[in-house]
Amino acid sequence: MAGARLLQEGRVSIVSFTLGASVISLPLLTSSFTEQTLLAAAPGRIALVFFIAALNGLLLLLYKAQLYQVAIRASFLGFAFGCGLLLSITQSPWKPFGWYVCSLSFFHYSEYLVTAMNNPRSLSIDSFLLNHSLEYTLAALSSWVEFTIETTIYPDLKQITWLSVIGLIMVLFGEVLRKCAMLTAGSNFNHIVQNEKSDSHTLVTSGVYSWFRHPSYVGWFYWSIGTQVLLCNPLCLVGYTLASWRFFSERIEEEEFSLIHFFGENYLEYKKKVPTGLPFIKGVKMEP
């Protein structure tokens, strides 16, 4: 029964994300709005408010309790994804921000969906990673503030299309690598570092794990940096790079203590052959 409930949550998330993303159809359904006026003009914003209210009402009718909590989060991410798409096809200086919103919303939604597919026993509302940490939230807010200020005082900085494209490629690479890592690890993957070995816990060394010891962290690292390259945010690019490097350095060391405890010599041999994948991060240092 638990498995069926969790699988249902995955299906609910797909439906809800799609409903939220359907906001992109508003300019197609009426000649009153274009992509630009829907997001920028007052009538368009009013239409978005009505869309959100109608969507929330529909979700309240369809789902109760825990399923509604899943649905409202997935639909919010879908709505953000749809608005990001609308923004990305405009000719405004905010076009790169549209790409960014699509990347951010899809990252959080796909974290939940892949967990539902891969490791339903660990699935929870927290699998969306929307409440990852205070530091994560502040980092996101900082990038939005920097983009807004620089767009206002120096809009040409945000018109370096080739740089934004490089950032988008980094984001896509990081996203694909992380999800490949999650799918390859299967039920071994968990958003929380495990300190106790479960009966089903095995050492995964195939697929992307034959390239890097920590491919999910490598993906997240380059995804994070790529978002700031995409936005042409020079200040946050430096900050994100340093903060991400420090976070993953500490996280990998913590995780590898557990992995050595779980798998002993097998992990030590694997560690000798395969790099972490992150620059200047070696993992746990073992005494000779």
Swiss-Prot record:
* Sites where the protein binds substrate: 251
Taxonomic superkingdom? Eukaryota
The record's subcellular location field reads: Endoplasmic reticulum membrane
Catalyzed reactions:
[protein]-C-terminal S-[(2E,6E)-farnesyl]-L-cysteine + S-adenosyl-L-methionine = [protein]-C-terminal S-[(2E,6E)-farnesyl]-L-cysteine methyl ester + S-adenosyl-L-homocysteine
Please indicate the ranges of residues that lie on the Lumenal side: 30-45, 92-96, 154-158, 233
Keyword list, A-Z: Endoplasmic reticulum, Membrane, Methyltransferase, S-adenosyl-L-methionine, Transferase, Transmembrane, Transmembrane helix
Transmembrane feature ranges = 13-29, 46-63, 74-91, 97-116, 136-153, 159-178, 217-232, 234-248
Q: Looking at its record, which EC class is this enzyme?
A: transferase
Q: Which residues lie on this side of the membrane: Cytoplasmic?
A: 64-73, 117-135, 179-216, 249-288
EC?
2.1.1.100
GO molecular function terms attached to this record:
protein C-terminal S-isoprenylcysteine carboxyl O-methyltransferase activity
> Under the cellular component aspect of Gene Ontology, which terms does the record hold?
endoplasmic reticulum; endoplasmic reticulum membrane
One Gene Ontology term of the biological-process aspect is:
methylation
The record's listing under InterPro entries reads: ICMT_MeTrfase, PPMT_MeTrfase
Membrane topology category:
Multi-pass membrane protein
Q: Where does S-adenosyl-L-methionine bind?
A: 194, 201-204, 209, 214-217, 255
Q: Would you identify the family this protein belongs to, as annotated?
A: Belongs to the class VI-like SAM-binding methyltransferase superfamily. Isoprenylcysteine carboxyl methyltransferase family.
- Summary of the function given for this chain in its UniProt record: Catalyzes the post-translational methylation of isoprenylated C-terminal cysteine residues.
Q: What is this protein called?
A: Protein-S-isoprenylcysteine O-methyltransferase
Q: Which organism is it from?
A: Xenopus laevis
Which gene produces this protein?
Answer: icmt
